[in-house]
């Protein structure tokens, strides 16, 4: 069996080569939210890109199983290719799950909402273009945190250093409420942050199917996220959180301030079944 993550050009070459060597072998590709744009466009392309386009479609014939994580991408693929390459027979909607087996080994005592703290967290590679940490910091500029604390978990890019210094120069009092804790590699220590927190914030410009959202939902965090396919699925039409327009830090600040002020109910997991993402 050949399993590849992401349907890239390299994946296409691996699949074709594998099928040449082992025609009866099984090939599977987990998209992880990513599909090369050349799948959906062949007009006005250079000769090299047109060749890549043909390679992708030849590969689509050879793939035996194609898993997608979000309903949006599943629908797009199904609609685009329903009449070709037996796509409906090989396309499977398979969202990322949560590792319950690891959780059982860590002796984490899960907190219900009444025992959680007034904490908002985010996690990821802080300062990268994808994660758009600046959007969160710009929102924090406008917020009165009161008795709430915000923890930013993850490695910090060099590009973010200047932005951080400027942020704390403008907001010296927030040194007592906004914390950069660095990357946490120990799973128990990381999950304890989710366990303590009431709110998880994600400001990414784009994502595949981020595991941080699955973890946030598993630990019953109210999720405030930019508009992403995975967020739309996990929030279930706003039941477990709110979607914020891309780049709109003012909207993010206003919504989070309403949470802090107690104007929005974030205790939304009363009837939630953890098996839904396990």
What are these regions (language model features)?
Residues 57-89, 98-100:
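A short, active-site helix/loop in glycosyltransferases that binds the activated sugar's phosphate group
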Residues 20-21, 47-66:
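Membrane-proximal helix-turn-helix segments that form the acceptor-binding/catalytic region
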Residues 163-184:
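Nucleotide-activated donor-binding/catalytic signature segment of Leloir-type glycosyltransferases, i.e.
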């Amino acid at each position: 069996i050949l399993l590849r993550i992401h349907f890239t050009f390299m994946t296409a070459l691996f699949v074709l080569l594998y099928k040449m060597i082992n025609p009866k072998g099984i090939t599977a590709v987990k998209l992880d939210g990513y599909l090369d744009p050349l799948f959906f466009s062949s007009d006005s392309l250079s000769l090299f890109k047109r060749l890549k386009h043909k390679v992708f479609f030849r590969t689509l014939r050879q793939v035996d199983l194609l898993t997608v994580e979000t309903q949006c991408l599943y629908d797009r693929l199904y609609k685009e290719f329903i009449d070709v390459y037996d796509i409906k027979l090989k396309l499977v909607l398979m969202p990322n799950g949560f590792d319950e087996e690891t959780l059982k080994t860590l002796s984490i005592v899960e907190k219900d909402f009444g025992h959680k703290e007034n904490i908002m967290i985010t996690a990821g590679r802080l300062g990268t273009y994808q994660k758009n940490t600046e959007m969160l910091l710009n929102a924090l500029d406008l917020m009165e945190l009161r008795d709430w604390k915000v923890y930013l978990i993850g490695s910090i890019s060099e590009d973010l250093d200047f932005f951080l210094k400027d942020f704390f120069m403008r907001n010296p009092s927030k040194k007592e409420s906004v914390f950069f804790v660095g990357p946490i590699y120990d799973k128990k220590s990381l999950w304890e942050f989710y366990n303590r927190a009431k709110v998880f914030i994600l400001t990414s410009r784009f994502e595949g199917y981020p595991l941080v959202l699955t973890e946030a939902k598993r630990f019953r965090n109210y999720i405030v996220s930019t508009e992403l396919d995975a967020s739309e699925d996990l929030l279930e039409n706003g039941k477990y959180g709110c979607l914020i327009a891309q780049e709109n830090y003012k909207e993010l600040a206003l919504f989070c301030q309403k949470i802090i002020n107690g104007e929005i109910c974030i205790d939304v997991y009363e009837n939630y079944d953890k098996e839904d993402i396990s």
